[in-house]
């Protein structure tokens, strides 16, 4: 009897922790590593959502602090995409589609350099790159759409819903 009471007490103590971890996952976007998102999208009908940002970017921070915290945006992204956050000016090599991409000009913060993966997936707009940029890629690594600049909640929902079938 004493042993079963201890087990029951242990279960009751753990239940709130299980609920807490599940609710935490629903309150934020489940950002993945690129390799994991690639693996999952190859086996699924879900596309990857690649969010390219850079440090000290006002609009990138607005996306993170305003758009990506909205419950309806979180649900739409978590339910329909494999999201990945990528620093478009990273100095680290990035493996994508079994190919290594580097930043071949990692100069000072003032230099207009970009990671080669960013340059491969993001098309210039009016002879410029804009931050942040969202690129939707399917499991065959084909780009479906790209959108640049700050997207408020309504625009994010509208743009992403147009992709989800």
Q: Where would I find each of the regions flagged by the language model?
A:
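Positively charged n-region of N-terminal signal peptides that target proteins for export
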Residues: 2-8
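Sec-dependent N-terminal signal peptides
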Residues: 8-17
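Bacterial Sec-dependent signal peptides at the C-terminal "C-region" and cleavage site
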Residues: 18-26
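A short beta-strand-turn-helix
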Residues: 30-48
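Short active-site neighborhood of thiol/selenol oxidoreductases, capturing the structured segment around
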Residues: 44-58
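Solvent-exposed loop/turn segments at secondary-structure junctions
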Residues: 54-59, 67, 88-93, 141-142, ...
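C-type cytochrome heme c attachment motif
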Residues: 55-62, 133-135
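Thioredoxin-like thiol-disulfide oxidoreductase module
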Residues: 71-74, 78-144, 163
